[in-house]
UniProtKB/Swiss-Prot annotation:
It comes from the Bacteria. Part of the 30S ribosomal subunit. Contacts proteins S9 and S11. It holds the Pfam family Ribosomal_S7. The keyword RNA-binding applies. It comes from Francisella philomiragia subsp. philomiragia (strain ATCC 25017 / CCUG 19701 / FSC 153 / O#319-036). GO terms for cellular component: small ribosomal subunit. This is Small ribosomal subunit protein uS7. SUPFAM superfamilies: Ribosomal protein S7.
Amino acid sequence: MSRRNRAPKRDILPDPKFKSQVVAKFVNHIMLDGKKSIAEKIVYGAFDKIKAKDASANEVEVFEKALDSVSPMVEVKSRRVGGATYQVPVEVRPERRQTLGMRWIIDAARKRKESTMGDRVAAEILEAIEGRGAAVKKREDTHKMAEANKAFAHFRW
């Protein structure tokens, strides 16, 4: 066990365009090699494409709805008991839910075939709202894993 204190949680400043912490966190997740301006262009470009598809919709609300449809409620964690390793289903904390949802949307977007990353992110968000897409499939697979291993739920710690 480490004797060091846990690092203090840093506050994330809301993004300049939408004044949303969730969008700022998404920009930070997309960012590679510290290039935040490029990450912002990708996210804001994706949001513009979402707005173009449905002018009446608020881009941030659409994104948050998509994030909610992708975020997992339960996941499995490995737990070793008496020489055997069990996949124990555990509930996901709200902060981790959001982080996993963002990570899965980005991973799914990076694997898509559209020409620009902005197009890929927009397409993945729109598919997530409709309940399809790779990110939603990842969530369903995670839930299936947890359901299949429900018998080991009593090994929770």
